[in-house]
């Protein structure tokens, strides 16, 4: 299984302000540079399974996926490695972040 670094920028879907305590930071998925993925809905579905569930709290790209509420949040950029096979056949189409989401961390 080959892993690579790639670039990502996407639209925010179902965005709203969140209040998160430190214990729930482990639920935040952080990625950077996932590039050339197509069709945002398919992209989000694939990313939810591909992203490394770890916190790189560098203030760049922050994503939280709450499947129960269908909540997706994207802010800035960060890094992660993806399986190369999952990026096969991907088109040159990058979705840019269009709105900011306030992310409140408490605790």
From Swiss-Prot:
Top-level taxon of the source organism: Viruses
Name of this protein: Protein beta
Native species: Bovine ephemeral fever virus (strain BB7721)
Classification lineage: Viruses, Riboviria, Orthornavirae, Negarnaviricota, Haploviricotina
Primary gene name: beta
